[in-house]
Amino acid sequence: MLRLFGAQSTAVGKTVENFPPQWRAAAQWKSRGAETLVALQAQSPSGLKKAAQALRQAFSADLYGAGETTLPAAVVEALERHDKLLICADAAAGALLEARLENLPGAEKVFDFGAVSYADPKTGPLIEKRARLPKDCTDPLRQALARAQAARRVVGADLSAACAERENDCVLVLSCRKGCFLRTVPAGENPALWLLDIIRRTAANKPQAEGTGFLPARRAAKKDALPGPQPKRHPLRRVCMTLLVLALLAALAAVGAWEYTNGNFYALPEQLHTLLTEHVPRPGATLV
């Protein structure tokens, strides 16, 4: 049995339909939320192996394990294999992860369970200070973005998780060196599993599931910096600048006309006519 998270059930069905007849393989799958379990059957070991390989290749990023492997165990394995340290930037993210990762072999090596991050009496306030949030900031997403990035820098971890809790949903944030992954999870879904999946994919450098966004480091820094409102420009400023340029050009033209006519503006039309007629080609002339 193969275990997928974030894969579309219809995509699994299409892959199974494309199994060549000579494999003599079939599959049954069941989805619960974002998780899909696929049970394979074949009349020969080679057919079973080829069918499993086809699914692994088609859903390489979604596949997190086989048999009795759980998603939390797959996350710990991915963090250990790629030597990544995971922390939480706030209590909301800690509540999602700590209960699911505790008692797993090796979890304490890759996850701090809040001991050196948000729950530490010294590090917690330092994270808030480094987040540089204005006192009047009430946007949960901006708070989560700022804390996730600040916590990763303060602790020196590879990955930092945060959770922005809102009335009808929550936004999961995972900060890494390149930026922040974000995913909005409705109230009816399981945010803990989605956060675990985002962590697993990031640790293994695999593509994220459809619907998970990414904010590059520079944009994320600007977003959590909460820049003040830009000064408003007066609506007539552009018109005034245009009129000023036109007035300047008119003044320059007047000075040129004054010099050309020796101060006699009445002679300007006649002199312009004379200037133009001198340059009109006459019969028999060669135009150079």
Question: Positions of the model-derived regions?
Answer:
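Conserved anion/nucleotide-ligand pocket segment
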Residues: 1
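Short amphipathic alpha-helix segments
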Residues: 5-26
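Short, conserved charged micro-motifs
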Residues: 10-13, 44-51
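Membrane-proximal helical "anchor" segments flanking the first transmembrane region
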Residues: 13, 34-40
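A short linear hydrophobic-aromatic micro-motif
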Residues: 23-28, 158-162
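Short alpha-helical segments enriched in small residues
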Residues: 47-255, 260-264, 269-276, 283, ...
